[in-house]
């Protein structure tokens, strides 16, 4: 009866025209209907993350571009794939393989037990997990296809229909687009290869740098291969071979490049021949003591290298290698900077003294060159001065101007026959007056007063005063006769004591005061007890007892 009533209720909706009903709906009602239909039956061709529409009515505050996000994810995934291909993630892959092998061994050993314990419920749960994994794989494939759509810019999600034949046509469209876009997948990989080859950020292109070194390019004064981890030992050896004949490169850096002893030996052979490189950096590599000692032996034939860095190697050098390094570098006089921390104090101090000696020699050489240059310049200056003395120099003052008026003419004196009259002769001096009589002479002047005795000023030369006092004491001691068994007390002068006391420093006075034993201070009780011990009964006298004590 219930089903019959339900069908009777549905029969009244069969006569309704759907087109008229949809035409009568407003735009808002149509949007709401679309939302309801999407929730009831979502589009299976869309990935799971895009099936649910945004329910927020607010406008977005930031700029969000889904196409840019998908393109970024695509680039990152390609970079990861490229790293795996180049061996960046080799260690992680090996660890995963080891873990998987252990799991396989564990499952094989316990397979018999697991088969017995396994029940029907567990089998059903395993089947459900497999189904869910298959669904996730299909969803991931759909996401990748959506990413390719947005990158190529030819397919949109609005054009996706619910037909079953659509996936096949979609795949064919993608293949045609990739083939007819003008740039195939190979060119796309090549365009992204520089970023994938050097994920560390080093912009050096290995082949171009090697070609420039071989051609002796004048602009290439530094070769920087730092942090390029996918470079091989053969490539580093090729760089060392190319640098043997190069005369321009001054700095060669290959830190953190996984270089080993073979690369170090190639660098040592290069340093024996090259006389232009001044700095080598091989820090953070896999070089052992053998490779480092090979480089140190090469420095015995190299007189140009001033800086060498080989710290932070994978293997520890050890005390024997450090001692050998110091022994080999004793005869080197050009190395100024060594980038390595010695573990032993002995080699460390020896290496410090060697580097200090080399820096001092370089300074002396530089000073000598400056003196020679100044000497050449001084000799040339002396020659120019002597040459300038022989030539008349120009006056610093300007020449006087000519007067606008003509100078007066001086008439010449004509000597005639007439002689001039003689000049008058001076009269003779008068005779001296006669001497006066004795009673008319003036009294003689009084005799001059005797000169006052000069007061001897006190000199402040303390040393002279001390010498005088000591000489006086010696004279007194020599003049007096010493008596046997008697000591003569020396009573120095007060002035000498004051002078000696003034010459002593404050510290000496404090030391003298502290060296003297301090005088003991007795209390009243001690004085009383000492008096009682020293007294006797005869010395005591009778004393009346006071009334308060009676």
UniProtKB/Swiss-Prot annotation:
<dbReference type="GO" id="GO:0005523">
    <property type="term" value="F:tropomyosin binding"/>
</dbReference>
<dbReference type="GO" id="GO:0051694">
    <property type="term" value="P:pointed-end actin filament capping"/>
</dbReference>
<keyword id="KW-0597">Phosphoprotein</keyword>
<dbReference type="GO" id="GO:0030017">
    <property type="term" value="C:sarcomere"/>
</dbReference>
<comment type="function">
    <text>Mediates nucleation of actin filaments and thereby promotes actin polymerization. Plays a role in the regulation of actin filament length. Required for normal sarcomere organization in the heart, and for normal heart function.</text>
</comment>
<dbReference type="GO" id="GO:0045214">
    <property type="term" value="P:sarcomere organization"/>
</dbReference>
<dbReference type="GO" id="GO:0030041">
    <property type="term" value="P:actin filament polymerization"/>
</dbReference>
<feature type="compositionally biased region" description="Acidic residues">
    <location>
        <begin position="95"/>
        <end position="105"/>
    </location>
</feature>
<feature type="region of interest" description="Disordered">
    <location>
        <begin position="359"/>
        <end position="527"/>
    </location>
</feature>
<dbReference type="GO" id="GO:0003785">
    <property type="term" value="F:actin monomer binding"/>
</dbReference>
<feature type="modified residue" description="Phosphoserine">
    <location>
        <position position="407"/>
    </location>
</feature>
<feature type="compositionally biased region" description="Polar residues">
    <location>
        <begin position="151"/>
        <end position="164"/>
    </location>
</feature>
<dbReference type="Pfam" id="PF03250">
    <property type="entry name" value="Tropomodulin"/>
</dbReference>
<keyword id="KW-0963">Cytoplasm</keyword>
<dbReference type="GO" id="GO:0005884">
    <property type="term" value="C:actin filament"/>
</dbReference>
<feature type="compositionally biased region" description="Polar residues">
    <location>
        <begin position="468"/>
        <end position="479"/>
    </location>
</feature>
<dbReference type="GO" id="GO:0003779">
    <property type="term" value="F:actin binding"/>
</dbReference>
<keyword id="KW-0206">Cytoskeleton</keyword>
<dbReference type="GO" id="GO:0031430">
    <property type="term" value="C:M band"/>
</dbReference>
<feature type="compositionally biased region" description="Basic and acidic residues">
    <location>
        <begin position="84"/>
        <end position="94"/>
    </location>
</feature>
<dbReference type="InterPro" id="IPR004934">
    <property type="entry name" value="TMOD"/>
</dbReference>
<dbReference type="GO" id="GO:0045010">
    <property type="term" value="P:actin nucleation"/>
</dbReference>
<protein>
    <recommendedName>
        <fullName>Leiomodin-2</fullName>
    </recommendedName>
</protein>
<feature type="modified residue" description="Phosphoserine">
    <location>
        <position position="24"/>
    </location>
</feature>
<feature type="compositionally biased region" description="Basic and acidic residues">
    <location>
        <begin position="359"/>
        <end position="377"/>
    </location>
</feature>
<feature type="modified residue" description="Phosphoserine">
    <location>
        <position position="11"/>
    </location>
</feature>
<feature type="modified residue" description="Phosphoserine">
    <location>
        <position position="15"/>
    </location>
</feature>
<feature type="domain" description="WH2">
    <location>
        <begin position="524"/>
        <end position="543"/>
    </location>
</feature>
<feature type="coiled-coil region">
    <location>
        <begin position="91"/>
        <end position="147"/>
    </location>
</feature>
<dbReference type="GO" id="GO:0030838">
    <property type="term" value="P:positive regulation of actin filament polymerization"/>
</dbReference>
<feature type="region of interest" description="Interaction with actin 2">
    <location>
        <begin position="166"/>
        <end position="500"/>
    </location>
</feature>
<comment type="similarity">
    <text>Belongs to the tropomodulin family.</text>
</comment>
<feature type="compositionally biased region" description="Basic residues">
    <location>
        <begin position="480"/>
        <end position="490"/>
    </location>
</feature>
<feature type="compositionally biased region" description="Basic and acidic residues">
    <location>
        <begin position="497"/>
        <end position="515"/>
    </location>
</feature>
<keyword id="KW-0009">Actin-binding</keyword>
<dbReference type="InterPro" id="IPR032675">
    <property type="entry name" value="LRR_dom_sf"/>
</dbReference>
<feature type="compositionally biased region" description="Pro residues">
    <location>
        <begin position="421"/>
        <end position="452"/>
    </location>
</feature>
<comment type="subunit">
    <text>Can bind at least three actin monomers and thereby provides a nucleus for actin filament formation. Interacts (via N-terminus) with tropomyosin alpha (TPM1) (via N-terminus). May also interact with TPM2 (via N-terminus). Interacts with FLII.</text>
</comment>
<feature type="compositionally biased region" description="Polar residues">
    <location>
        <begin position="391"/>
        <end position="402"/>
    </location>
</feature>
<feature type="compositionally biased region" description="Polar residues">
    <location>
        <begin position="170"/>
        <end position="193"/>
    </location>
</feature>
<feature type="compositionally biased region" description="Acidic residues">
    <location>
        <begin position="113"/>
        <end position="145"/>
    </location>
</feature>
<feature type="region of interest" description="Disordered">
    <location>
        <begin position="84"/>
        <end position="202"/>
    </location>
</feature>
């Amino acid at each position: 009866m219930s089903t019959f009533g339900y069908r009777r209720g549905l029969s009244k909706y069969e006569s309704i025209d759907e087109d008229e009903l949809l035409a009568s709906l407003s735009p808002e009602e149509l949007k709401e209907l679309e939302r309801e239909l999407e929730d009831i039956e979502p589009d299976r061709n869309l990935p799971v993350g895009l099936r649910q529409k945004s329910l927020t009515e607010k406008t977005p505050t930031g700029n969000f571009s889904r196409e840019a996000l998908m393109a970024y994810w695509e680039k990152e995934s390609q970079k990861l794939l490229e790293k795996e291909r180049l061996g960046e993630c080799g260690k992680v892959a090996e660890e995963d393989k080891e873990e998987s092998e252990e799991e396989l061994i564990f499952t094989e050993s316990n397979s018999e037990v697991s088969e017995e314990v396994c029940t029907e419920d567990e089998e059903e749960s395993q089947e459900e997990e497999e189904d869910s994994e298959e669904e996730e794989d299909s969803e991931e494939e759909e996401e990748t296809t959506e990413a390719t759509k947005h990158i190529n810019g030819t397919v949109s999600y609005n054009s996706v229909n619910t037909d079953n034949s659509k996936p096949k046509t979609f795949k064919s469209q993608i293949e045609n687009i990739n083939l007819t876009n003008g740039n195939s997948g190979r060119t796309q990989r090549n365009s992204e290869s520089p970023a994938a080859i050097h994920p560390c950020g080093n912009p050096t292109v290995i082949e171009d740098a090697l070609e420039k070194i071989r051609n002796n390019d004048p602009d290439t004064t530094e070769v920087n291969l730092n942090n390029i981890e996918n470079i091989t030992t053969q490539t580093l050896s090729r760089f060392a071979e190319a640098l043997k004949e190069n005369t321009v490169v001054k700095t060669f850096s290959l830190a953190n490049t996984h270089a080993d002893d073979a690369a170090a030996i190639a660098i040592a052979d290069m340093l024996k021949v090259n006389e232009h490189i001044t700095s080598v950096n091989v820090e953070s590599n896999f070089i052992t003591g053998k490779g480092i000692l090979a480089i140190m032996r090469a420095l015995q034939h190299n007189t140009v290298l001033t800086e060498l860095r080989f710290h932070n190697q994978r293997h520890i050098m050890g005390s024997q290698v450090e001692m050998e390094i110091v022994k080999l570098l004793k005869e080197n006089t050009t190395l100024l900077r060594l980038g390595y921390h010695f573990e032993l104090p002995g080699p460390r101090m020896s290496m410090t003294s060697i580097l200090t000696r080399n820096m001092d020699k370089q300074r002396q050489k530089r000073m000598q060159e400056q003196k020679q240059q100044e000497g050449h310049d001084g000799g040339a200056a002396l020659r120019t001065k002597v040459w300038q003395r022989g030539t008349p120099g120009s006056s610093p003052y300007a020449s006087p101007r000519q007067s606008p008026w003509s100078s007066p003419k001086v008439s010449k004196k004509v000597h005639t026959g007439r002689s001039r009259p003689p000049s008058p002769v001076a009269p003779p001096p008068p005779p001296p007056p006669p001497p006066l009589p004795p009673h008319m002479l003036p009294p003689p002047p009084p005799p001059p007063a005797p000169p006052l005795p000069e007061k001897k000023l006190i000199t402040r030369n303390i040393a002279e005063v001390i010498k005088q006092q000591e000489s006086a004491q010696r004279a007194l001691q020599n003049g007096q006769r010493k008596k046997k068994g008697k000591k003569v007390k020396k009573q120095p002068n007060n002035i000498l004591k004051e002078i000696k006391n003034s010459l002593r420093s404050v510290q000496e006075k404090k030391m003298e005061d502290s060296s003297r034993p301090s005088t003991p201070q007795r209390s009243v009780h001690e004085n009383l007890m000492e008096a009682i011990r020293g007294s006797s009964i005869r010395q005591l006298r009778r004393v009346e007892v006071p009334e308060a004590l009676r």
